[in-house]
């Protein structure tokens, strides 16, 4: 028996072993995924208006959020209560300062709206010192009875200013072999590395050896063994460790868009631009911390439906402080050249997943959308 497929294909799903969803552009994201919620984080909206002195059911969850990103030290690892206490008030004030919000110490609407935005999993505060303010030698000290609010907007570095040693300016990177990525996906990372090498004295080369590469990249779900578990769709998107660790992990549960077509992307609330996240996390791999400059690549959050890949002066100054300037850098950043093959997605939109498991609902949606007509011929 011959099996023939005839139909007008508008969408096509490719399923392969490993773990992540990729879409070539935002129009390939099915309607059912365009308004996916952030699950646990969206519930934080219930705390809008909470302030010091109140006891609100479930408020301990937002304390855990702040602890995850460093605003509450690990020393407060006991059972959190639902009291809006001094510890939470100090955390809220520091968060508001870091993100240039009105410092009220309350969970006002703007603060909650910002908290639920998808973000990098790296902390903003380490050992009581904010990484988002103060530049390379000025720190932003946190006292949990009083928050010092003086700060200077500037790029920041990890504590101790770790960086790749001078004899390692040609770095290799490799993908976890458990993630059989397509060339289109790999090219996204190549472009992201190129944005940093364009401005500084570093070179990046793709390697086939995951075990010996300087930088290792993988897509994982949930608890994947590094103490920084992922949380499903949206929420924390990725994290990377400071030099010379080289570990770069992305959440495989996200809906990753490989080619950012900004106009149509704006209406997609559950898809994330892969290159935008990759450029940010590479900054961490090279030694940059989070910046309070909202336009910078190293700003911790990125809204869905947004593409943000161009380095700002803040990013360039930070990376050149660590490694010096690329002698060919002319003072401006521009997108890497793109081949025609990378620009064109053909006459149809494709989505592919690297995972042995599959989202049956997505498969059925795709099949119903494409208008397939199946003919079985003897």
UniProtKB/Swiss-Prot annotation:
<dbReference type="InterPro" id="IPR021158">
    <property type="entry name" value="Pept_M10A_Zn_BS"/>
</dbReference>
<dbReference type="GO" id="GO:0046686">
    <property type="term" value="P:response to cadmium ion"/>
</dbReference>
<feature type="glycosylation site" description="N-linked (GlcNAc...) asparagine">
    <location>
        <position position="330"/>
    </location>
</feature>
<keyword id="KW-0732">Signal</keyword>
<comment type="function">
    <text>Matrix metalloproteinases (MMPs) or matrixins may play a role in the degradation and remodeling of the extracellular matrix (ECM) during development or in response to stresses. Required for plant growth, morphogenesis, and development with particular relevance for flowering and senescence. Active on McaPLGLDpaAR-NH(2) (QF24) and myelin basic protein (MBP) and, to some extent, on beta-casein.</text>
</comment>
<feature type="glycosylation site" description="N-linked (GlcNAc...) asparagine">
    <location>
        <position position="46"/>
    </location>
</feature>
<dbReference type="GO" id="GO:0031012">
    <property type="term" value="C:extracellular matrix"/>
</dbReference>
<dbReference type="InterPro" id="IPR001818">
    <property type="entry name" value="Pept_M10_metallopeptidase"/>
</dbReference>
<keyword id="KW-0378">Hydrolase</keyword>
<feature type="active site">
    <location>
        <position position="281"/>
    </location>
</feature>
<dbReference type="GO" id="GO:0008270">
    <property type="term" value="F:zinc ion binding"/>
</dbReference>
<feature type="binding site">
    <location>
        <position position="284"/>
    </location>
    <ligand>
        <name>Zn(2+)</name>
    </ligand>
</feature>
<dbReference type="InterPro" id="IPR021190">
    <property type="entry name" value="Pept_M10A"/>
</dbReference>
<feature type="glycosylation site" description="N-linked (GlcNAc...) asparagine">
    <location>
        <position position="127"/>
    </location>
</feature>
<feature type="short sequence motif" description="Cysteine switch">
    <location>
        <begin position="118"/>
        <end position="125"/>
    </location>
</feature>
<keyword id="KW-0217">Developmental protein</keyword>
<comment type="similarity">
    <text>Belongs to the peptidase M10A family. Matrix metalloproteinases (MMPs) subfamily.</text>
</comment>
<keyword id="KW-0336">GPI-anchor</keyword>
<keyword id="KW-0865">Zymogen</keyword>
<feature type="lipid moiety-binding region" description="GPI-anchor amidated serine">
    <location>
        <position position="349"/>
    </location>
</feature>
<feature type="binding site" description="in inhibited form">
    <location>
        <position position="120"/>
    </location>
    <ligand>
        <name>Zn(2+)</name>
    </ligand>
</feature>
<dbReference type="GO" id="GO:2000028">
    <property type="term" value="P:regulation of photoperiodism, flowering"/>
</dbReference>
<feature type="signal peptide">
    <location>
        <begin position="1"/>
        <end position="20"/>
    </location>
</feature>
<dbReference type="GO" id="GO:0050832">
    <property type="term" value="P:defense response to fungus"/>
</dbReference>
<dbReference type="InterPro" id="IPR006026">
    <property type="entry name" value="Peptidase_Metallo"/>
</dbReference>
<dbReference type="GO" id="GO:0005886">
    <property type="term" value="C:plasma membrane"/>
</dbReference>
<dbReference type="GO" id="GO:0004222">
    <property type="term" value="F:metalloendopeptidase activity"/>
</dbReference>
<dbReference type="GO" id="GO:0009753">
    <property type="term" value="P:response to jasmonic acid"/>
</dbReference>
<feature type="binding site">
    <location>
        <position position="290"/>
    </location>
    <ligand>
        <name>Zn(2+)</name>
    </ligand>
</feature>
<feature type="glycosylation site" description="N-linked (GlcNAc...) asparagine">
    <location>
        <position position="102"/>
    </location>
</feature>
<dbReference type="InterPro" id="IPR033739">
    <property type="entry name" value="M10A_MMP"/>
</dbReference>
<feature type="glycosylation site" description="N-linked (GlcNAc...) asparagine">
    <location>
        <position position="79"/>
    </location>
</feature>
<dbReference type="InterPro" id="IPR024079">
    <property type="entry name" value="MetalloPept_cat_dom_sf"/>
</dbReference>
<feature type="glycosylation site" description="N-linked (GlcNAc...) asparagine">
    <location>
        <position position="143"/>
    </location>
</feature>
<feature type="glycosylation site" description="N-linked (GlcNAc...) asparagine">
    <location>
        <position position="203"/>
    </location>
</feature>
<feature type="propeptide" description="Removed in mature form">
    <location>
        <begin position="350"/>
        <end position="378"/>
    </location>
</feature>
<dbReference type="GO" id="GO:0098552">
    <property type="term" value="C:side of membrane"/>
</dbReference>
<dbReference type="Pfam" id="PF00413">
    <property type="entry name" value="Peptidase_M10"/>
</dbReference>
<keyword id="KW-0472">Membrane</keyword>
<dbReference type="GO" id="GO:0048046">
    <property type="term" value="C:apoplast"/>
</dbReference>
<feature type="glycosylation site" description="N-linked (GlcNAc...) asparagine">
    <location>
        <position position="35"/>
    </location>
</feature>
<feature type="propeptide" description="Activation peptide">
    <location>
        <begin position="21"/>
        <end position="154"/>
    </location>
</feature>
């Amino acid at each position: 028996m011959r099996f023939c497929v005839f139909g007008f294909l508008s969408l096509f799903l490719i399923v392969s072993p490993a773990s992540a969803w990729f879409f070539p552009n935002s129009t390939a994201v099915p309607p059912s995924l365009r308004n996916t919620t952030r699950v646990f984080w969206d519930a934080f909206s219930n705390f809008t208006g909470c302030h010091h002195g109140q006891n609100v059911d479930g408020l301990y969850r937002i304390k855990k959020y702040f602890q995850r990103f460093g605003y509450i030290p690990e020393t407060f690892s006991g059972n959190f209560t639902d009291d809006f206490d001094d510890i939470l008030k100090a955390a809220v004030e520091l968060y508001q300062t870091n993100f240039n919000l009105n410092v009220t110490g309350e969970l006002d609407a703007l603060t909650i709206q910002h908290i639920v935005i998808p973000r990098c999993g790296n902390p903003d505060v380490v050992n009581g010192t904010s990484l988002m303010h103060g530049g390379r030698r000025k720190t932003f000290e946190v006292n949990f009875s009083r928050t010092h609010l003086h700060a200077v907007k500037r790029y920041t570095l990890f504590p101790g200013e770790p960086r790749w040693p001078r004899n390692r300016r040609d770095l290799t990177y490799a993908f976890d072999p458990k993630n059989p990525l397509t060339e289109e996906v790999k090219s996204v990372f190549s472009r992201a590395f190129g944005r940093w090498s364009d401005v500084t004295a570093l070179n990046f080369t793709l390697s086939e050896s995951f075990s010996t590469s300087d930088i290792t990249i993988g897509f994982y779900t949930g608890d994947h063994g590094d103490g920084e578990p992922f949380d499903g769709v949206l929420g924390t998107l990725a994290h990377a460790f400071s030099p010379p660790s080289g570990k770069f992990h992305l959440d495989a549960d996200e809906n990753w868009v490989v080619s950012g077509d900004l106009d149509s992307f704006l209406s997609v609330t559950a898809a994330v631009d892969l290159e935008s996240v990759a450029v940010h996390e590479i900054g961490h791999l090279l030694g940059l911390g989070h910046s309070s400059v909202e336009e910078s690549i190293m700003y911790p959050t990125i809204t869905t439906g947004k593409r943000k890949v161009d380095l700002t002066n803040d990013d360039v100054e930070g990376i050149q402080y660590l490694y010096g300037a690329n002698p060919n850098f002319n003072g401006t950043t521009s997108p890497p050249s793109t081949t025609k093959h990378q620009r064109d997605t053909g006459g149809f939109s494709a989505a592919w997943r690297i995972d042995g498991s599959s989202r049956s609902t997505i498969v059925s949606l795709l099949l119903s959308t494409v208008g397939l007509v199946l003919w079985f011929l003897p």
